[in-house]
């Protein structure tokens, strides 16, 4: 009887350990366009470029009311990247992470001013330890533009466009390119960090298209890549199929993961 009790206890402990290990994962959800949610093992949540109500997301109007956020990261000032940030921030109390000038401009546009400051504002070359040390966020450049507002007569200064490298403690390293063209210094990102997941724009017209995005993956040496910023508008003509073909030629070792809007992957 004693042996049976010990055996059952061992099985229970093994089961609990397996469950804890399964939960100790980072999850990434795509809301369409450039909007991603990163769920950390602790339960904390990072949103990037949260245009949750973008036209590719059929549940956007509901999602924007329920999405969680502890931090909101914005790559640049265009409307399709600031998106629903202010409304989400007012509901969740999420702090804003952005380059300093961009952050100030977003606050001037209505983002709660007590949810942004020197602790979450930075600039290229800088890194922030966030969420009690569970993650480090680094600011990296992008080649794009960053005006705030679509009316040329009223467009405001939005700082410089950029991307983010997010290193989860004991977990994956994720690079969100923001909107950008291919540029040579992407190789420095690949040499400084071991990028597990690259979230890469591929839509062409306003950013690099599939061929140049594949070159970017090669420079970054990303293990896995998820295409984004395509198909939202007719002019964003780059497709995941074209990107996949280019990857096979240019960066064949990279794993291509094509997400559907609303999909979640576990790292």
Which functions belong to the PLM regions below?
Residues 48-49, 69-77, 97-100, 174-178, ...:
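Active-site neighborhood of phospho(di)ester-bond hydrolases with catalytic His/Asp-centered motifs
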Residues 2-45, 52-54, 138-143, 261-263:
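Zn-dependent metallo-beta-lactamase
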Residues 41-79, 83-90, 98, 104, ...:
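Pre-active-site segment of Zn-dependent metallo-hydrolases
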Residues 146-219:
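Active-site-proximal loop/helix segments of hydrolase catalytic cores
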Residues 22-26, 40-46, 127-138, 167-174, ...:
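Beta-strand-turn-beta hairpins that frame and shape the catalytic cleft
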Residues 107-131, 214, 218-267:
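Binuclear metal-ion centers of metallo-dependent hydrolases, dominated by the metallo-beta-lactamase
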Residues 83-86, 97-100, 106-111, 115-126, ...:
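Glycine/small-residue-rich loop that forms an oxyanion/phosphate-binding "nest" at active or ligand-binding sites
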Residues 54-55, 79-83, 103-106, 124-128, ...:
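Active-site environment of divalent metal-dependent phosphoester hydrolases
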